């Protein structure tokens, strides 16, 4: 198997694409310098995937195959929601035992609910990945360009050190994360809990599970993250909440883990907003979320029927 870094990329605007291409060029230079031992040049899907891809299912399959052929994952990760497909790729790569090294330049930190602990992006992301973070906010417009360039250089220096730690010598990957014997029929996405609409839906789902004499466990991304991942691994099926244009990054990561352990989830998505990419119509969910789910559930009645069956 080649030693190679899969570089995730938010595709939807020029700035993100250019930033990722520049990141690949920088990492490739580190490889040429011998800092990352035995590594091939980076794999960037938008640059290296096969051409003439016919549809989103092919994109999904190509990216899963590419991740399987790599040995680590890296990329920019700025923003609280970011891109759900990138979140999925992190969760899936985590199940393969890959080192995951990400860059964030946000000065925001986030906490779920009333917790006093704040994290870059999320506590879950900080558990499954190593983040290179320089959260400066320059309050002055004077010399703003130079200050931002200096911030990038500092964050790249941290990333380089993190990558050298993981790939400066040849070492085996961590064991793959597998499913565990089933103790719960369903695992409920913790992100149901953070809005009134989500809590209302979760109560209806819990009622349906109890009515079907089945069992469940609440997801919890506020406490012991590894325990929460273990509960997902002990569940027959996850039920995830993707009812916004860009689902919370934790939902994407957890769905990647569920897919990686071979238990494809139900993904709740009643949002009817759609979009065009070029001349092609798509639904509003990222293809990595769509095709890693057992089914996309569009109403609580449909979900209740699945639980009862």
Where are these regions (language model features)?
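Conserved catalytic or regulatory cores that recognize and/or transform ribose-phosphate-containing ligands
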Residues: 1-309
